[in-house]
Amino acid sequence: MVSQFAIEVRNLTYKFKESSDPSVVDINLQIPWNTRSLVVGANGAGKSTLLKLLSGKHLCLDGKILVNGLDPFSPLSMNQVDDDESVEDSTNYQTTTYLGTEWCHMSIINRDIGVLELLKSIGFDHFRERGERLVRILDIDVRWRMHRLSDGQKRRVQLAMGLLKPWRVLLLDEVTVDLDVIARARLLEFLKWETETRRCSVVYATHIFDGLAKWPNQVYHMKSGKIVDNLDYQKDVEFSEVVNAKVNGQVAFENDNNKVVISKVNSLHPLALEWLKRDNQIPDKEIGI
């Protein structure tokens, strides 16, 4: 059976044992298939914790999480066969792919090993067409040796490894920070194409907003473990070419219809900056800027 939503979360609260306050508080989400969701928030807002819960890396004890209709912590979610695929096809997909900060520090990236050898060890020959596409998109030379690469080059190889096997739900946590502008733009365009051509969805937490103006379907703002803003990109976000009384600086909030107006730029950076300033509650003038 094909689930109605890629991700469904009900009344999710999570607290680390060593913490007195929960990191995630009463989260409710319904993320449809074929969508791209952007998660915005200051450090410590709960973004990484939420993504780890969605991936099954933390056990949910208070609330309910369904990814592709199943609990991500359940072993059943690894071998699910949906109505729109055969058993053979299902082996070519994994329900959830999580690429986060600890994944970026895997020890193998510093070994003296060839890139092609590394890719072949995780199924490059089986997913050759997809692998070759990722190599082109990320501008990877398969003759590279991993221990000789820059941080940015290593990150590109890691992303090719992480994205090689197709996924139903992709969870990205700050993994594009080392990419140059071109590699990042190509990667985002590839992920957009993926969500438009097959049944899958992406949730992306980041502090880098340039080039994202036309990318997401939903924008979620997290503060103190809660989702405090949830914007439908088509309905709630407007880019204005005229900076007038309606737009105070670069962003204006219309309280009557929950709409956000942003001065005409190809970036969600002004909105993210305004949200984080409000979260911080310290006016710029008080810190001398």
Curated annotation (Swiss-Prot):
Presence of keyword Electron transport: no
Name of the molecule in the record: CCR4-associated factor 16
Binding positions (ATP): G41, A42, N43, G44, A45, G46, K47, S48
Subcellular location: Cytoplasm; Nucleus
Subunit structure: Interacts with CCR4 and SSN2.
One GO biological process term: regulation of transcription by RNA polymerase II
Lineage: Eukaryota, Fungi, Dikarya, Ascomycota, Saccharomycotina
ABC transporter domain boundaries: 7-249
Record's keyword terms, sorted: ATP-binding, Cytoplasm, Nucleotide-binding, Nucleus
One family name in Pfam for this protein: ABC_tran
Organism from which the protein derives: Saccharomyces cerevisiae (strain ATCC 204508 / S288c) (Baker's yeast)
Gene behind this protein: CAF16
